[in-house]
Amino acid sequence: MKDQFARLAAWQPFAKAGNWPDADMLAIGELKPHPGYGEPRSSRLTYDEQKTLLTLWAIAKSPLIVGANLTLLDAKTLTLLTNADVIALDQEGTGEFEAKHEGAMIAWRTSLPKEREALAIFNTGDTPLSVQRDFADFDADLGTRHWKVTDAWAGQELGRQRGVDATLAPHSCLLLVLSPEKLLPEKLLPKLHKEHE
């Protein structure tokens, strides 16, 4: 799986409308190979690794080809494969690129409709990774606005944020959807304050 980070980053300059970086099938769930090509087995990836795999494929706009037997999906795997925010990355994201690569930390960014942005941060290392960064550290453009942030995998709204403060388990990821916060023009603030006195 680690090799795919470098491979998808190298392919990205060639990704455009009508061309997709094909990272191969998603090795998630119950894998039932064609007769003569090995024994049936469950994915050898941990749950965190499966999330990382799916997040990377989606934000890089690889086709999401499920390699599992769909009739044998358990509830946990089905939840992974049907996450609406993750599917939107793959189907609606534009301008995706690897925004940062420092040691075990790799971050990708893509733009979404309605002026939203997505930021995926991966820990490719074998030990926990502490990430305390302003959004601008990943891309200067992200530092020019105020954002309402949603953790896409947890389905949790994190409120107004200017950066990331998280610890990622080995081989795990954090997928954030950033929505622009509509701020009142500064010239209106004194007027509103006076009306509420």
Segments and roles (model prediction):
Residues 34-35, 65-67, 73-77, 126-129, ...:
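Flexible loop/turn segments at secondary-structure boundaries
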Residues 136-153:
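Solvent-exposed beta-hairpin/edge-strand motifs
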Residues 1-68:
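Glycan-recognition surfaces
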Residues 52-100:
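Catalytic cores of secreted or luminal carbohydrate-active enzymes
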